């Protein structure tokens, strides 16, 4: 990227950007919710479109001069509809959390009962956590995983639904490595007369590529982010049945947002366009292959995987038998240029800011070009760091940097 102007006008921010670039360039990025966008996506985000205010929707704006940016939003909507075979979409949400809020506020009233996946078992803050708006505005009841299989307990979900008669059942997760049975959830929703909402933020790209069953035919509402596996700009989007479209659009604007971010919407259009290409399916296939091999290698080194493995892009690693917390391993790996995040495991006895596990994912390293052999090396680096946690880590760090140099970013 050309930062010549910024370098001259704001050396402080330029310096911070350069520092972050060095970190990304020389580090192995394993945070499951992160990815590296294409240069095309970044160019759209940094374009003249950032200058345009466009409250409202294409053809129905509250500002003049929107006839060009209307084309960008129409293109983003059309591409998203094609990608997910959707009836109605809205590409204006600023984030995944905003998308979830919009769905809730379009069909629920404060105090309504909602069923959502427990944050401690892999759900998301906006699926009913007491510290989130969702848990404060609505009466969320949590379902979780079966303690033996560490798979979603659909029997418990049904029992809770029959008992509490929720207005909505929310599925989708932020730390769940297995496939989700959307058909079964639809059946439970129908049995109790509940709306079905799916937050597919983490697996949207996998669904777009046809490597996970799509929730779109089953759900009333589907929300997503556009980064993560979709590899687009940071933002949100919503799919719904046509009959809910008008109410949903009105909830987003003027309900919870003002002007949309037209430069981000254009970048969303770019990422949807990229995801419609055949090579994107190959990319998603490699993400899944990399995750499986990565998991198998970690198991060889004695790490335990929650549920025993993965069907998607992420792994939840139980560190209990390694006598190290998620917090400590996150900090340890930072020292060797490997980035992970501490994460609670199901039925975790440690605090959320300590945790007994880490969450790792393969979208970013796959974008970088890593394949199965590189993932074996990454597992080796992690195990070596754990074994030498009290010793000199400089040799591991050098090996990590050498691997990154063999797979340069944005070149």
UniProtKB/Swiss-Prot annotation:
Its EC number is 2.1.2.1. GO terms for cellular component: cytosol. The keyword Magnesium does not apply. Its cofactor is pyridoxal 5'-phosphate. Keywords: Amino-acid biosynthesis, Cytoplasm, One-carbon metabolism, Pyridoxal phosphate, Transferase. One of its GO terms (biological process) is glycine biosynthetic process from serine. Coiled coil: none annotated. It comes from the Bacteria. The keyword Translocase does not apply. CDD domains: SHMT (cd00378). It is found in: Cytoplasm. One of its GO terms (molecular function) is pyridoxal phosphate binding. (6S)-5,6,7,8-tetrahydrofolate binds at residues 119, 123-125. It catalyses: (6R)-5,10-methylene-5,6,7,8-tetrahydrofolate + glycine + H2O = (6S)-5,6,7,8-tetrahydrofolate + L-serine. Gene3D superfamilies: Aspartate Aminotransferase, domain 1, Type I PLP-dependent aspartate aminotransferase-like (Major domain). PANTHER family: SERINE HYDROXYMETHYLTRANSFERASE (PTHR11680), SERINE HYDROXYMETHYLTRANSFERASE 1 (PTHR11680:SF35). Belongs to the SHMT family. This is Serine hydroxymethyltransferase. It comes from Clostridium kluyveri (strain ATCC 8527 / DSM 555 / NBRC 12016 / NCIMB 10680 / K1). The gene is glyA.
């Amino acid at each position: 990227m050309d930062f010549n102007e910024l370098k001259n006008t704001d050396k402080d921010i330029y310096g911070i950007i350069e520092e972050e670039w060095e970190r990304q360039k020389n580090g192995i990025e394993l945070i499951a919710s992160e990815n590296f966008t294409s240069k095309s996506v970044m160019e759209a985000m940094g374009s003249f479109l950032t200058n345009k205010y466009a409250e409202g929707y294409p053809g129905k704006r509250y500002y003049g001069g929107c006839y060009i940016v209307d084309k960008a939003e129409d293109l983003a909507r059309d591409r998203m509809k094609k990608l997910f075979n959707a009836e109605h979409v809205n590409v204006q949400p600023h984030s995944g959390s905003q998308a979830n809020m919009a769905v809730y506020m379009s069909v629920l009233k404060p105090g309504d009962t909602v069923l959502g996946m427990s944050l401690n078992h892999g759900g998301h803050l906006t699926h009913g956590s007491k510290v989130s708006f969702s848990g404060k505005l609505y009466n969320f009841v949590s379902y979780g995983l079966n303690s033996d299989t560490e798979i979603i307990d659909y029997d418990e979900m049904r029992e809770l639904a029959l008992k509490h008669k929720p207005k909505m059942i929310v599925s989708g997760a932020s730390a769940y490595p297995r496939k989700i049975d959307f058909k079964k959830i639809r059946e439970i929703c129908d049995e109790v007369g509940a709306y079905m909402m799916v937050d597919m933020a983490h697996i949207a790209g996998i669904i777009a590529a046809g490597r996970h069953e799509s929730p779109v035919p089953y759900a009333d509402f589907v929300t997503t982010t556009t980064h993560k596996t979709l590899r687009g700009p940071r933002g949100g989007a919503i799919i719904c049945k046509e009959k809910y479209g008008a109410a949903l659009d009105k909830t987003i604007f003027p309900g919870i947002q003002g002007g949309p971010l037209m430069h981000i919407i254009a970048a969303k259009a770019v990422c949807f366009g990229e995801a419609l290409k055949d090579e994107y399916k190959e990319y998603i296939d490699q993400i899944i292959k990399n995750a499986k091999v990565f998991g198998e290698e970690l198991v060889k080194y004695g790490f335990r995987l929650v549920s025993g493995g993965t069907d998607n892009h992420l792994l939840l690693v139980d560190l209990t038998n390694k006598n190290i917390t998620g917090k400590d391993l996150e900090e340890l790996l930072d020292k060797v240029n490997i980035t992970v995040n501490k994460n609670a495991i199901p039925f975790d006895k440690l605090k959320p800011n300590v945790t007994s596990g880490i969450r790792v994912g393969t979208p970013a390293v796959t974008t970088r070009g890593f394949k199965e052999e590189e993932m074996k090396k990454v597992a080796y680096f992690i195990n070596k760091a754990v074994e030498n946690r009290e010793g000199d880590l400089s040799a591991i760090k050098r090996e990590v940097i050498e691997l990154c140099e063999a797979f340069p970013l944005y070149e």
